[in-house]
Amino acid sequence: GLARTLFSWTLHAIVYFWLFPAYIALYTLVPKAAGGRVFSDQMGRVAFIMLLVFSVPIGFHHLYMDPFQAAGWKFLHMTGTFMVAVPTLLTGFTVIASLEVAGRLRGGKGLFGWIGALDWKNPLVLAALLAMLMLTFGGFGGMINASYAMNTMVHNTQWVTGHFHLIFGGTTVIMYFAVAYYLWPKMTGKELFSTGLANAQLWLWFIGMLVLTLPWHLIGITGQPRRISSTPYDESLVQQWGTSELIMVVGGLILFISALMLVYVLFRTHGNSQAVANPEVEYAESLHSTPRMPHLMNSYGFWVAMVVVYMIARSEEHTSELQS
């Protein structure tokens, strides 16, 4: 029980440290690259604070079926897991609204005309739109994982693996790729080798991730375990997994080709003789005026201290739980 407790509590929180940089790029780089502004600076700040507070103590939703965890702690972590959906929805709303502002400024008309007016040739804009789609699918799976009742159907199955690959390998990593395409030319002083090839790489990653993770969810629903020492491969249920696993192999190959394309574009960019037109990193500004924040609230040291105190408190809480 101790190993599973520490594993679920620590490693689930760690994935949010990978997600945070992707969110930062969505708020600070994407609106400017799209030609607009951040729809709400305050909403972004609230989303980050909520995500920080609720993302740390929620790992026990992987242990709903574990007999070593008390029901009260499971309920607490279930509540925290559902609360993570709030900053996620705030982020999705703010980013999409920021893109709509950019689309309207570029001449987009009608209810959805702003989507077509966006600069789809810009890797940052394209990646943000694809990331939002994968975050939508992955977020839906996360709500099922959070539910104490529905979790019983997917507990310790490949559904869980498909879910976090769609969020991390999809939403997070595709934003990392786009940021690399944005920052690498500014760091090297060389113009991006091929915007078209960069966009093709992003599309391939999006397609490959869906081809990989959707069958992963399916075989999870049909009962393929996430961790098991042995499997009776002669049963008819196990034989039904073959087609989905073959499709997943195709998805993995697509992702591999996409990753090679990323390396190729960055390598050719490094050797490009054409200098980058604008070497400065441009950050997005808020659409609405931002009220002055107390100096303490903008202090990096203050928030580091808050996180340390918070994590120590959570450690003491889990220690007392294990002792009881």
Residues covered by each model-derived region:
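Histidine/acidic residue-rich metal-binding segments in metalloenzymes
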Residues: W114-L124
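Juxtamembrane inter-helical linkers in multi-pass membrane proteins
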Residues: G1-A3, R104-I115, Q274-H288
